[in-house]
Structure formats: structure tokens, C-alpha cells
Amino acid sequence: MMKQQKVASVATILKRELQPTIKEWLRRGNLVPELTDVPLSDTDRNAHLPKLYADLICRLRLAKDTHPPVSIAAAAHGKIRREQGYSASMLIEESRIFQVSTFSTLHVHQSELDPAKLLSDVMVIADEVDA
């Protein structure tokens, strides 16, 4: 008799895998010369991520027809980055890395995810990153 694997939500996986996902984001970010040209410590470079992921996880757990709240953390992060010397294109690159790191985590754990809900959650992630 086969053991049935427990299905987890995207929000659950992202919450559980927060630290490895942030570590992957930092690794990818440190490979982009445009970003590393601004001298920041690893802590300064990724301090915004726990709150951004908390906002994303909260949004993933909302009912699908609920109007999403505005991410105050994302706006604050943009302001801080501007003060640190980031350009708009650098912020876009950070957002792209956020999305790729998030999807990489989901890919690693895809066997735990409900395929019927995955695509709609990916759409929420893409919308949140683009907001």
C-alpha cells in the first residue's frame, strides 16, 4: 500500500522555507554586478525580504475574490533603496530575483503542492511582484 503524501499550500511552503529562499535570493542578487556596485552588507541587502514574504503569504491566504491590500513593506523598501542609490532598473532586477527565488523554492517542493491550486497561486505571486 502506497503512503499518501500530504499536500501543502504555496503559502505554507513559502513560510516554512523562508530562510532558504532568502539565502537563494541573496546568492542570486550577489551575482548581479549592477546590484553589487552599491556597497551593502548582506543584512542591508536582504533585510526587507521577511516582511515582503509575510505580505505575500498573507495575500496567498486571502479568499480569491478579496481585493489585495497594498504592501507597505514594498513601498518602504523602494524608498530605502532609492536613498541607497538604486535606480528603477535595479529595483526591477531585485523584483525579478524575488520572483525567480520564490518559484525556485516552489519547484524544489512541487511534489508537496496541490497542482489544482498551483497556477492560481503563481498568478498571485506574479501580480504581487508586479504591484
Where are each of the predicted segments found?
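Alpha-helical/coil-rich non-catalytic "connector" segments in signaling and regulatory proteins
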Residues: 4, 24-25, 32, 49, ...
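Amphipathic alpha-helical segments that form the core helices of the histone-fold
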Residues: 37-57
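Hydrophobic alpha-helical core bundles mediating ligand binding, dimerization, or RNAP-core interactions
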Residues: 25-29, 49, 53-56, 99, ...
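Long, amphipathic alpha-helical coupling/dimerization segments that relay conformational signals between
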Residues: 2-15, 64-131
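Generic alpha-helical propensity signal that fires on short helical segments
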Residues: 32-34, 39, 104, 109
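N-terminal intrinsically disordered, cationic/polar leader segments
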Residues: 4, 8-16, 20, 28, ...
